A protein has these predicted regions:
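Bacterial Sec-dependent N-terminal signal peptides
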Residues: 1-21
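Aromatic-residue-lined binding/catalytic grooves and analogous aromatic/hydrophobic interfacial grooves
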Residues: 20-454, 460, 471-473, 491-494, ...
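Short, surface-exposed recognition loops and adjoining beta-strand edges that mediate ligand/DNA contacts
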Residues: 27, 362-380, 497-520, 587, ...
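Charged/polar positions within long, soluble alpha-helices
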Residues: 301, 353-356, 499-502, 506, ...
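Well-ordered alpha-helical segments within folded domains of soluble proteins
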Residues: 385-395, 459-470, 539-549, 602-611, ...
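Non-catalytic carbohydrate-binding regions of carbohydrate-active enzymes
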Residues: 470-476, 481, 485, 493-503, ...
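Loop/turn elements at helix/coil->beta-strand transitions in domains of secreted/extracellular proteins
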Residues: 478, 487, 508-510
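Acidic/histidine-rich catalytic neighborhood
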Residues: 495-554
Length: 804
């Protein structure tokens, strides 16, 4: 290997990295016929699914605050804690059947459901054959666009959802004066009324359920034509002989916070909607568009990625590109493969920016988008992986603004979680949250006494979430946020679990959880019992171990004295064990999994998204535990649901196996047919739908975000060493680079320690690098098989060039 000299200079101009990313766009040569073919738009609160039909353009509308339900009852489950000692008694007698049965007494009500706001239909009154159809979603500008010819006239529609101005806009034009003739209709699947007046449609309604106990909404659609005539009748606006037209959509709901009744204490949704409609007069369409693009690009443009060194012209429709990507008979050229892989990465960033900008209301299972009255799994917040996975790319992919809704949501959970801790578990200090939640910040176990404990009774959701918030601090280095928001949430969760731990009946010096479950998985005991409830589950202890270790670091960061009681309990936690097959045991005993390929790999949380598995291996100078994690992944296999596939990309990357991580990434990008399509060539498995939505199946957005995070993890990994007097951040560049990505460049990727990195690599070696620090920080940076220690100063820029 040629010797490389590292030329380092602070604020020096040595080698600037400017990633030349090609235009990022999804495009199609036909309208959408299914939800999974539609184009998603969102401003973080309002969402639209654009089908782009020529005779009837269906646009499903969503508002991320439009849910069933009302605030949780603080007395829900009061007295259920009495069953916990009985369950423990059964478990310690190895009577797992009785424990499973008793778990049903510690279940509460189901969570609320996320529901669609309404449907806007634009009906073309012109007739005649259509040709030259084109439909596009431009990720670089967050604009959707369709165009077609009819009777020799060129028609175009442009759509966007602006966060800055809180509206959705549609602009319709033709290249011939007076050619636009259409109906505009607004309807909903939930109870509603629509009124047409002058050039405006106003719809009021509420989610399913009692009118006096539901979230209400007011949606206003304004039609502003140039030329032509508008007639309002019933629930329809009719426009004839217009030159062009602009449609504005605004909405407000009565949702006023997790602890506010949506009717008795609801927001003034009608007044708020009317005020939003008035705002549409403040700017022209082009001005709204310019404001939208500028605000969006301030965040989106932070990260640019170029994989490979060959240009691609994007001359294949995205659905065909996706089909051929995994085809053995008509494989894509290398440049096309790299383009799709980059497009999927940026699509994940686009989605998170589009669905997570509302205070205290994070992205749900659907992100923001659903056409279904009752979405799969209620469209809720599933906290045993899915909600957490939604936010994996937020920091590394340089979109920290999107994580603020999650922080506010967890604050709400900490309030309701105190009641759950007391009523369901008999613990009066601290808080916890279970498996499913909603905007009302439900924290209690669900199931209503009849669902399987494997998912309904798990209570580690809050702990996993606060671990994610601590990780956000490591990226942001915002000590005020840590002190005022994140640390109090961590402390409350820690207090609960310090009391939840019990003495291991087999080894009195150890602490375990009881009852315990491993999310959605089932075991088979050595006596043949097929069950779900156990004690000392590995996933439980992994999350608690991560929490206590993070608490140690947080206290040190804030200058607080060590918590000796917590530290003692951390050291007493039942350790990881390795099974007879060399895998990491998921259960206290070396039991068989009912499904060895199960989608959840919860006992690997300490590897990713957690950090402690590698830390333990380093401290003990024993890699056995990492080898066991690897063997577990081998046993699991490479094919699973969409979100699980996204998780496995990151797990393999964390193990440093870039080629295997890439293989899983390829699986994630395998074509999946829309759910409503059942032709002979239909394909239904985990992967990606024609519009690049993640296929569980059905659609769940978490896999999109897991995939985007996985790309980041293959390119850059970071961790913190808190053992020294001052934290040292370890940065590893190209730690899991696939062979097929031997050349590339990225701009704007973030690391723990508050660093922003631009780099270029050739033949798997970094050739130019720029590091910008958000705060004073000590780093140990590893690349090209060498390590360098640096002290960076806030605002400083270090540029490094490899010199022969």
């Amino acid at each position: 290997m040629k010797r490389i000299l590292f030329c380092i200079s602070l604020l020096a101009i040595v080698a600037s990295v400017k990633a030349q990313q090609p235009a990022m766009r999804l495009w199609y040569n036909q309208p959408a016929h299914f939800f999974e073919e539609s184009l998603p738009l969102g401003n973080g609160k309002l969402g639209a699914l654009v089908y782009g039909g020529t005779q009837k353009d269906t646009i499903y509308l969503n508002d991320i605050t439009y849910w069933t339900g009302k605030p949780v009852d603080p007395n829900e489950g009061l007295g259920k804690a009495k069953w916990i000692p009985e369950i423990r008694k059964a478990l310690f007698a190895e009577d797992y059947r009785t424990a499973d049965s008793l778990q049903h007494f510690v279940q509460g009500e189901q969570s609320a459901s996320y529901q669609p706001l309404g449907t806007l239909n634009i009906i073309n009154l012109n007739t005649g054959a259509v040709s030259n159809y084109y439909r596009e979603l431009n990720l670089d500008s967050a604009l959707a666009h369709i165009s077609y010819q009819q009777n020799g006239i060129q028609f175009t529609r442009e759509y966007f959802a602006t966060h800055r101005d809180s509206l959705i806009a549609i602009h319709i034009k033709a290249n011939q004066a007076g050619a636009i003739n259409l109906h505009i209709q607004l309807t909903a699947q939930t109870p509603h009324k629509v009124k047409a007046t002058n050039n405006q449609l106003t719809m009021t309604g509420h989610t399913t359920g009692s009118e006096t106990e539901s979230v209400h909404a007011c949606t206003i659609v304004r039609l502003l034509p140039q030329g032509g005539k508008v007639i309002a009748s019933d629930s329809t606006l009719t426009l004839t002989n217009a030159n062009n037209a602009t449609i504005y959509i605004v909405n407000a709901t009565s949702f006023n916070g997790f602890d506010k009744h949506p009717v008795k204490d609801g927001a003034s949704y009608i007044d708020n909607a009317v005020n939003a409609a008035w705002h549409t007069q403040n700017f022209t369409y082009n001005e709204f568009k310019d404001r939208h693009i500028k605000e969006y690009q301030q965040i989106y443009n932070r990260v640019k990625l170029q994989l490979g060194n060959k240009e691609y012209t994007n001359n294949l429709p995205t659905d065909q590109l996706l089909r051929r990507y995994s085809s053995s008979t008509a494989p894509l050229p290398e440049a096309a493969q790299r383009y799709l892989e980059t497009l999927y990465f940026q699509f994940g960033r686009y989605l998170l920016l589009s669905c997570s900008r509302t205070p205290n209301i994070p992205a749900n299972l659907q992100g923001l988008w659903t056409p279904h009255l009752f979405s799969p799994w209620r469209g809720n917040y599933t906290m045993n992986i899915n909600l957490e996975e939604n936010y994996w790319p937020a920091d590394p992919a340089n979109m920290s603004e999107t994580i603020q809704p999650l922080i506010g949501f967890v604050k709400g959970l900490s309030a309701t979680g105190k009641h759950t801790a007391r009523n369901f578990y008999g613990i009066n200090d601290g808080w916890c949250a279970a498996h499913n939640s909603d905007p009302w910040c439900k924290t209690s176990p669900v199931g209503e006494g009849k669902e399987s404990p494997e998912w309904a009774n798990w209570n580690l959701g809050g702990a996993w979430l606060v671990n994610a918030l601590w990780d956000h601090y490591l990226y942001s280095q915002d000590k005020q946020l840590l002190q005022n928001s994140i640390y109090p949430l961590m402390e409350g969760s820690s207090k609960f679990f310090q009391q939840w731990l019990v003495t291991n009946p087999n080894k009195p010096n150890e602490l375990i959880t009881a009852p315990s479950t491993s999310p959605e998985n089932e075991y088979i005991t050595d006596k043949g019992y097929h069950g779900t409830t156990c004690y000392g589950g590995t996933a439980d202890l992994a999350i608690i171990r991560e929490l206590f270790m993070n608490m140690q670091q947080a206290r040190k960061s804030l200058g607080l004295k060590p918590d000796k009681e917590m530290d003692d309990k951390l050291h007493r936690l039942h350790p990881y064990t390795v099974g007879s097959q060399g895998d990491l045991n998921e259960w206290y005993y070396d039991w068989k999994d009912y499904d060895i390929h199960h989608r959840h790999q919860s006992h690997l949380i300490g590897l990713y998204p957690g950090m402690h598995l590698q830390a333990l291996a380093k401290q003990t100078k024993d890699s056995t535990i990492l080898a066991a994690a690897r063997q577990t992944l081998i046993q699991k296999g490479d094919e699973s649901t969409g979100w699980s596939t996204g998780w496995r990309i990151n797990l393999w990357a964390r193990l440093g196996d870039g080629n295997h991580a890439y293989k899983i990434y390829q699986n994630l990008l395998s074509y999946v047919s829309p759910e409503g399509y059942h032709g002979k060539d239909a394909v239904h498995h985990g992967g990606t739908y024609p519009n690049l939505f993640d296929a569980h199946p059905p659609f769940q957005i978490d896999g999109n975000f897991g995939g985007t995070a996985g790309v980041c993890e293959m390119l850059v990994q970071s961790s913190v060493d808190m053992t020294a007097k001052k934290p040292v951040y370890n940065i590893h560049l190209l730690p899991a680079l696939p062979d097929v990505w031997a050349n590339g460049e990225i701009k704007g990727i973030r690391t723990r320690g508050g660093l922003t990195i631009d780099m270029k690599w050739e033949n798997k070696l970094v050739t130019s690098l720029q590091i910008k620090a958000a705060t004073d920080v000590d780093v140990n940076i590893t690349y090209n098989n060498k390590s360098s220690k640096m002290k960076l100063r806030k605002g400083g820029i270090i540029k490094i060039s490899s010199c022969k």
